[in-house]
């Protein structure tokens, strides 16, 4: 083995390098020739194998020839009687993963070791054999493996059981035949054998709930003695309790009693596992109390691992049931000064969740002394906990905002500073009294901020919120400093922010004009262009609208064209005398190009430029407008994503795309024939619109021929009332003439047979008439909507699994675009606000504010507020929700 390389540094301190420092594959392969020596040197061979294993584990690749040569050389080492070398040989064979041809060569040696009198040889031979053999060879050694499972030596039995766990993935039918032997292993007096036996038995039965329930019921009566196996059994027991929700509560009681009994076990790991599982379950406060008591005792343990496990579990409980953890607050406060920073961090964040309003100031003082000693990742956790606490006790915002401000001045990375800024922004938006002090803290931060992203984000916030404060002029100095001192990106953001102050605060407009004129001499094009645009807009020289409201809409309004769609349209735009018309750009957020199924293996040539993405509506518009029957339908409003009408792996793959016009709907059926021996001709879809009374079929375009694996389209058009979100259910039958094809010659029989194929029903729902269009600033967009168009009502959504499910269901019904990440519901939240935007058929902009709350154990109530360009559309949104 290579000797450690020693080196003296300038401070005369010894630096010890890895014993493998500087080894090369070529040199090690040369050394591997020692395996062929007639007189084997076990020590030298062990060193060479160790180097080979090191290279393999470092990701070094061996060619096929190199791997084969090493494998054959290693097999020569079976003649050595050195136990240490033999164990390395086993490892080497596993790492090389020999091919099926090479496995035969080593199988006989491993079989011999598997029947050896040396237990170490037997155990390792079993592990290696099960790693390298296939199903055919497995049947030949199955008898030996079953015997090994019940072997008296625990090392051999564990090796066989662990091998069974690995083999179960590829050869489940064979391993399932070992159930009797595995059950016997579960009763073993050896801890590891019982642990591995229980793990394998559970995997064998994992798809049979009744068998798992019976297994758990039998084992919970006291036959499991191994602490490791006890931990597994606790997990399986909690799984049975969760899955038996259909049964009465009484039937779960024996299982829960077992979990409670484990809280009094002599093994600490069993106690912790039981407490953790009880804490994760939906139990009453009385049932949870024993687990909390046990965890509280562990908080004062002398073992760091027990303190960490206990405080981590309590931290999770505090997220959903903070009152249950309040009794532990005194012990948690003592852990804030724990030498282990992970324990201290968890203790602090738990206290922040369980603390009351009177303890906030004391907690903040302790946290201040603590923050400098922990890493950024832990600081982020603390900052997020403080944000939640501030929202819980808004009257304490001053002390917490002051803490966040001080944290901004400390050293830290981007993610840490971003977490603080995001927290301050959240508090500004949720606590009105905190707005001005929060904005000032952010202004002080950007005076010495090294992160361009954060500076731009804060400047954007200042532009939106600053003009609405009591003294907007106090922010101008901070903003203009960015124009003087920062990079081009931040300077451009600062110019836009100044313009917003000029537009909204008339008293500041002359001063803003002076500052913007100075920006006309900036070295960066973007900064100069923005300054020019805003000066001419605010001065009235460039007409962006007839009223002051139009000017503010220009400055503050949301950009309702997705940037990806705009980019695609600009790439296809050909410079001409006509100006670029942004109204022609698709406003759909989720764009999906129309793609045909490619033959397998066909890829674009290397280096070929990727085609620019084309919004789905643009692609479909070109196809539909080229069909004379549809050319008079007008502008395509929306195309849905494909809806599958057949199961996977069926004879014919069919999906449908719904194309929505103002007074028509076109159904595009995309069909693929997956049977090589068939050719389909005169293919059409018969659509029954009996359950869609407002629709009447006007025309259809059948498919003349549908060869194997060549997609084709069938179109069926319906007329409906103009600008009305008509809904209905359509049943579909695919009809065609099928002809046999000789796959060897490609010849098609002349005679065909009429046939039909029933496919799934299709529904046109209200969400199909809504475009998912985002707004960049929901608050400004909402305020700019006519308040007279607002309609508000409350609804009961019934029993739901969670608020997240309720939010997802309403978004799905409306088909609108969530804004500002509000579709994500914080875990265990009891109330939530979701903001949605979209464009309803007839090009009416719609904004929705949804307020959810839990009115009972799982009863969800919702308040729906809608604003729109058209008050009638606001009423329709309420009708959709009421009928949904």
Curated annotation (Swiss-Prot):
It is found in: Cytoplasm; Golgi apparatus membrane; Cytoplasmic vesicle, COPI-coated vesicle membrane. The keyword Oxidoreductase does not apply. Residues 602-612 have a biased composition (Pro residues). InterPro entries: ARM-like, ARM-type_fold, Clathrin/coatomer_adapt-like_N, Clathrin_app_Ig-like_sf, Coatomer/calthrin_app_sub_C, Coatomer_g_Cpla, Coatomer_gsu, Coatomer_gsu_app_Ig-like_dom. GO terms for molecular function: structural molecule activity. Residues 592-612 are annotated as: Disordered. Keywords: Cytoplasm, Cytoplasmic vesicle, ER-Golgi transport, Golgi apparatus, Membrane, Protein transport, Repeat, Transport. HEAT repeats lie at residues 65-100, 101-138, 286-323, 325-357, 358-395. It is a peripheral membrane protein. GO terms for cellular component: COPI vesicle coat; endoplasmic reticulum; endoplasmic reticulum-Golgi intermediate compartment; Golgi membrane. Pfam families: Adaptin_N (PF01602), Coatomer_g_Cpla (PF16381), COP-gamma_platf (PF08752). GO terms for biological process: endoplasmic reticulum to Golgi vesicle-mediated transport; intra-Golgi vesicle-mediated transport; intracellular protein transport; protein secretion. Oligomeric complex that consists of at least the alpha, beta, beta', gamma, delta, epsilon and zeta subunits. Belongs to the COPG family. The coatomer is a cytosolic protein complex that binds to dilysine motifs and reversibly associates with Golgi non-clathrin-coated vesicles, which further mediate biosynthetic protein transport from the ER, via the Golgi up to the trans Golgi network. Coatomer complex is required for budding from Golgi membranes, and is essential for the retrograde Golgi-to-ER transport of dilysine-tagged proteins. This is Coatomer subunit gamma-1. The lineage of its organism: Eukaryota, Viridiplantae, Streptophyta, Embryophyta, Tracheophyta.
